[in-house]
């Protein structure tokens, strides 16, 4: 939130977004109101099989036994949405996962709920349904050794409760 902009002062403005090149400006307060600031889109090189999570250096995690998009993840989801809007021909496969702390059947069901919830969130935010496929993988693709019976921290388990956005076209 800004207070009054003083015309005699110099201000520093930084425009930053995952889909655009960061741009910085120095302007006098009196010039801000009618000044146009332009930022250029990033050119992201993608190919089928790439994961938007890795390309954007973000994380989409879920709470234990939950499938809704957590408030913290909404910021990261906005970055995925921005890329999908910039590249309207991009199609992705949403792959959702769980940790290993329940039965395999339970985790497979939960991961399918996560995948569907993630897809529905994207659709609700303007991404066409025909650009999205989704599937839950349960605990079958853990990122670490936190398998059944292995003692792990909450943080280690958290790494496995995730969604990936794999480019398919």
Give names to the regions the model predicted:
Residues 2-91, 154, 169:
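Periplasmic peptidoglycan-binding/tethering modules of Gram-negative envelope proteins
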Residues 95-169:
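Periplasmic OmpA-like peptidoglycan-binding domain that tethers envelope proteins to the cell wall
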């Amino acid at each position: 939130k800004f207070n009054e902009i003083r015309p005699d002062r110099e201000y520093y403005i930084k425009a930053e977004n995952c889909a655009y090149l960061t741009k910085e400006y120095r302007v006098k307060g009196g010039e801000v109101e009618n000044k146009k600031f332009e930022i250029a889109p990033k050119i992201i090189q993608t190919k089928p099989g790439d994961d938007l999570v890795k390309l954007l250096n973000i994380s989409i995690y879920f709470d234990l036994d939950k499938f809704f998009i957590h408030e913290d993840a909404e910021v990261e989801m906005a970055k995925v949405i921005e890329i999908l809007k910039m590249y309207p021909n991009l199609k992705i496969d949403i792959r959702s996962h769980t940790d290993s702390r329940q039965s395999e059947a339970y985790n497979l069901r939960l991961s399918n709920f996560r995948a569907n919830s993630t897809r529905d969130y994207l659709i609700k935010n303007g991404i066409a349904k025909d650009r999205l496929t989704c599937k839950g993988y349960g605990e079958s693709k853990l990122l670490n050794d936190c398998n059944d019976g292995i003692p792990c921290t909450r943080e280690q388990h958290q790494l496995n409760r995730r969604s990936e956005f794999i480019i398919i076209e």
